[in-house]
Amino acid sequence: MIVAVAAATIAVTPALAAPDRAPASVAIREAMAASAAGWNAGDLARFVAVYAEDAVFVTPKGLVRGKAAITARYAPSFTGGGNTRGRLSFVPAELRGIDPTHALLVARWTLTGATSTETGMTTLLFERRGDAWKIVADHSS
């Protein structure tokens, strides 16, 4: 299971393009790009920095609760100073503001490895926490 993170520019829907929400789309885009860069550099801490401490992650095997558990779930993929699963990218399908402190991102993730490519969809609920936008719910398939 892969958590989608942005390596590409996010297409902003009109709901987030309003002047009062434009900074949200920029901040989410930057947080996702930093997370993707962490994945691709083999930096687990940087990859999971986008998650809130109390985030939930829905996987085919069940619910993972909390950033520490999400980090532990991904740790086996980050060995020897790299990432053993390949290069992560995604194509956003929709980024929609829900209210001033919440936004929903739907995207297709792609993981390109040496011998195979995996792809799927993800739905990420972001919440503004202080000066940062954090993933509070991740459903990837």
Report each predicted region and the residues it spans.
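Short beta-strand edge/turn micro-motifs at domain boundaries
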Residues: 119-141
